[in-house]
Amino acid sequence: MANTASAEKRNRQAQKRRARNVQVRTGVKSAVKKLREAIAKGDPATTQAALKSAEKTIGKAASKGVLHRNAASRKISRLAKAAAKPAAAAAK
């Protein structure tokens, strides 16, 4: 329990930030899930649209400080690689 007014305020602010960050993280997870589902279906157009959306969502999370920029970059890279795999297999 906070003993001072400033500690109470810090607690309120932390709760607001946490709620906001959880919402952003949930959006990232949802975008990644949609992309993985699109990859599983094998439709290139849907996959590209989902990849673009996921990249945008992850980039925004990194810019807001919810994700570290290197973690966001790594996640985008791995998702792009996974999205390109079925297209490369179909081209052979």
Swiss-Prot record:
Q: Which UniProt keywords apply?
A: Ribonucleoprotein, Ribosomal protein, RNA-binding, rRNA-binding
List cystine links: none
Which parts of this chain are annotated as the region Disordered?
1-28
Q: Pfam families, from UniProt?
A: Ribosomal_S20p
Identify one Gene Ontology CC term for this UniProt entry: small ribosomal subunit
Molecular function (GO) terms listed? small ribosomal subunit rRNA binding; structural constituent of ribosome
Q: Which GO terms describe its biological process?
A: translation
Q: What does this protein do?
A: Binds directly to 16S ribosomal RNA.
Similarity remark:
Belongs to the bacterial ribosomal protein bS20 family.
The name of this protein is: Small ribosomal subunit protein bS20
Q: Which organism encodes this protein? A: Anaeromyxobacter dehalogenans (strain 2CP-C)
